[in-house]
Amino acid sequence: MCPDYDQQEDHFVKAIVNTKLILEDGIVWNGAITWEGDRITQVGEADAVVIPDGADVIDAGGLYTAPGLIDIHTHGSTEHLFCEEPTKCAEHFVRHGETTVLPAFYCNLNLEQMVAGARRVREASKSGVGRILDGLYMEGPYMNGQGSNQKYILWGGEIRREEYAPLLEEVCDLARVWAIDPAREGIEGFMADVRERDPQAIFAMGHSHATAADCRRVKKYGVKVQTHHGDSGKAPGKAQGTIGAG
């Protein structure tokens, strides 16, 4: 079951009954759950959950109720990109059980497109289904400077503060994760400036031909995630596979 985000601010008690509850340690086959506002107040076997008088009761008809899925890296739905249509994308993902999403912007967007997209996401996240949008996953601006997919990378060449400063000004409070290529010359200056603005910023390594030494060098800035780490170019040997964006 997916929550009704248009009613999320209501503070009267709601309940889901006649449902199979997926919990951390198993399934409650005849379960019930109550919540008030954004807090779950009871969960368990139906006969052990007290439904208050006047509660808004939803009969699940035997369907499953599960914790919402969290997606920290997705560019859009089957029809739309988050940078262009964040609300339509949010509608798609909440229908599939995702209740927290970080829209991902790729380095094929220029500065103006990233800023405009961030503003759309920020506005969409304030109400309705858009409230599942909990920040940005910045797959850029500084990804792999060599290897595959170069024609789509708009942030190549030298990393300059005057180039990225307007982006940080606009999105640093919204971005949760910044994907970077540790092998890019000048990447440490960019990472240091991000952390100065947001000490809680998380970095992801990806789309990179970095060596182990490159990766160790940037660890101190808060690298906690890896993504697409195997697509930086052709593999050696006969079984080379194909080159792509991930």
Map each language-model feature to its residues.
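Active-site mouth loops of central-metabolism enzymes
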Residues: I72-E84, Q150-G157, I202-A204
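Divalent metal-coordination and catalytic microenvironments
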Residues: T19, I33, D38, G62, ...
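Charged helix-capping and loop-helix junction motifs
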Residues: E84-T87, A116-V121, R160-R161, K238-G244
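Conserved phosphate-binding/catalytic loop of the ribokinase/pfkB sugar-kinase fold
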Residues: G145-L167
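Active-site core of metal-dependent hydrolases
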Residues: E169-G246
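Hydrophobic faces of well-ordered beta-strands that scaffold small-molecule active sites
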Residues: G68-T74, V101-P103, D134-G140, R176-I180, ...
